[in-house]
């Protein structure tokens, strides 16, 4: 019973997405501007510091309150400090 309800909800969701895409028109979906906007979403962002579990070589690579853990592979972990 639960499986059939989940399958029904999934099918309805897919149908909703397809009909909303058709309403917008295929010319909008094929436009280069749309493709460029999607490209920007998936490009990696260069940051000044590494976030939690990000790769690092030294403590200064990591963001505030994080330190470089030198276990293989090296990663940024919490340095047990607090602040604003």
Curated annotation (Swiss-Prot):
The keyword Cell inner membrane does not apply. Keywords: Amidation, Disulfide bond, Ion channel impairing toxin, Knottin, Secreted, Signal, Toxin. It holds the Pfam family Toxin_12. The keyword Disulfide bond applies. Residues 1-21 form the signal peptide. Residues 22-47 form a propeptide. The modification Phenylalanine amide is found at residue 82. GO terms for molecular function: ion channel inhibitor activity; toxin activity. Expressed by the venom gland. Its main location: secreted. It is found in: Secreted. Belongs to the neurotoxin 10 (Hwtx-1) family. 05 (F4a) subfamily. The presence of a 'disulfide through disulfide knot' structurally defines this protein as a knottin. This is U21-theraphotoxin-Cg1b. It comes from Chilobrachys guangxiensis.
């Amino acid at each position: 019973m639960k499986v059939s309800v989940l399958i029904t909800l999934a099918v309805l969701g897919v149908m909703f997405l397809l009909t909303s895409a058709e309403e917008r028109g295929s010319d909008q979906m094929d436009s280069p501007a749309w493709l460029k906007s999607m490209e920007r979403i998936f490009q990696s962002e260069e940051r000044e510091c590494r976030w939690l579990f990000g790769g690092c070589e030294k403590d200064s690579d990591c963001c505030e309150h994080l330190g470089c853990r030198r276990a293989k592979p090296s990663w940024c972990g919490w340095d047990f400090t607090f602040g604003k």
